[in-house]
Amino acid sequence: MIEYFFILVIGLIFGSFLNVLIYRIPLEISLLRPARSSCPKCQSPIKWYENIPIISYIFLNQKCSNCSNPISAMYPFIELLTGILTVLLYIKYMFNLELIVIVLLFYNLIVLSIIDLRFKSVPDYLLILAILLALIIGDLKNALIFMGIFSLLELILTFYIQKIKSRITNNKRLESQSSLGNGDIPIAGVIGGLLGFQLGVSAIFL
């Protein structure tokens, strides 16, 4: 149990770092400077004891200590998700080179998914890294099949979802817009290459 708790703590710490990546990468802010994160609203530097995964979020009452700006629940969610995922992967693979590659891949997918969800676009280098990591431990054939299937799925979803939005808002321009992010198809390919066809289908629809 102590071993798993230690792995959980490591996962939570990495989850906090993933939050930094998710915030800074789309805004093209250096990952090195400033070294300390700050409040997006008042730019007040976040003290070390205000940056403890999950715990600080609870004790700060979900708001900035300086300006009382609400802190998004997405931060502790990503930390907890990363922590739990790290423990589960450790239990399955134990400590070896394969575990390191798989953990890096899943961390990358978390960053890709959240950025894609928020901005409908993802950096090419993160996609390339995810695909390379998936190919190391996955199946190229499954990846290509999944990219094709998900591309078709995007067309169908875009047609129906945007048509409904167009009717509700009486805005015909919405019919030509995509309802999914630009990174969804490559991400689907990575999932397919990693999990295989049957598990990949389940993961996509979940």
Question: For each of these PLM feature ranges, what is it?
Answer:
Residues 1-6, 167-169:
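Short, Lys/Arg-enriched, disordered terminal segments
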Residues 3-27:
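N-terminal signal-anchor transmembrane alpha helix
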Residues 14-19, 82, 86, 146-154:
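Alpha-helical transmembrane segments of multipass membrane proteins
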Residues 18-74:
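Membrane-proximal soluble regions of multi-pass membrane proteins
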Residues 24-32, 91-95, 117, 158-167:
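Transmembrane helix-loop junctions in multipass membrane proteins, especially transporters and channels
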Residues 62, 68-140:
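Intramembrane alpha-helical segments
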Residues 107-206:
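Functional transmembrane core segments of multi-pass inner-membrane proteins
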